[in-house]
Amino acid sequence: MKNVLSIQSHVVFGYAGNKSSTFPMQLSGIDVWALNTVQFSNHTQYGKWTGMVVPHQQIPEIADGIDAIGELKNCDAVLSGYIGSADQVAEIVKVSHLVKTRNAAALYLCDPVMGSAEKGCVVADGVREGLIDIALPQADIITPNLLELRELSGLRAENFEQAVIAAQHLLTKGPKTVIVKHLGSAGKYPGKFDMLLANREGVWCLSRPLYPFAKDPVGVGDLIAGLFLANLLNGKSEPEAFELTGNAVNDVMEITHKLNSYELQLIEARHAIMAPQNRYKAEKIA
């Protein structure tokens, strides 16, 4: 069994951060060591929430505790997502380094959540800069959305061709693999939910239906990052992991839409996560 140290947000109600990625990774046969960056009542896109940011010192303290009992060497990957403070960024990267000293084959997947005023996703000051300056160069895999792709690359990425160039540019910044979780307005196919995979072997696009939610559910990016990492650790090639992830997430979104839910319906979709319908193919474009 593979083990992932997942350093993300926790919400008591609903699904985002570790609540969105842990259960699907477990369904995929991965043991998840969840370390929370914040504990909130609910995700920030409700517009109001209660809770706290975890003190940044606790992140290395927890990792050191796992190391002290001799288990950190069994960690196969570090996954980071929503970060609660600028100080947490450096601590998370230090933890990824510690894990790699204990297991040289371990991966670091950074899901660079930067927030969006338009969507109501609130991220602390300094996190964006920390992700660009500290996390990006150290990540093996980076999984931005379109806005984050623009911020990380410094390129416009206003259309599909520009998004491909921006993703390829990120490969020169440190990561070996780039997943653009949602191309949005820069998608290849209008009216679809398009994702992109770029690595040194090529570029792939996967297009699936875009479901007409009254309010788009939160936590989809967390789900994508977690499932892609789980599929990789289960021995799939990157294009295979990308395709499996896209199909599993589509099934989750289809079920969530049918139930008219603002929160991801991961429990209802559990069987689909374990055995997704392989309806949508990853198209190699470069």
Curated annotation (Swiss-Prot):
It holds the Pfam family Phos_pyr_kin. PANTHER family: PYRIDOXAL KINASE (PTHR10534:SF2). Its EC number is 2.7.1.35. Pathway: Cofactor metabolism; pyridoxal 5'-phosphate salvage; pyridoxal 5'-phosphate from pyridoxal: step 1/1. It comes from Actinobacillus succinogenes (strain ATCC 55618 / DSM 22257 / CCUG 43843 / 130Z). The gene is pdxY. The keyword Lyase does not apply. This is Pyridoxal kinase PdxY. It catalyses: pyridoxal + ATP = pyridoxal 5'-phosphate + ADP + H(+). Substrate binds at S9, T44, Q45, D222. SUPFAM superfamilies: Ribokinase-like.
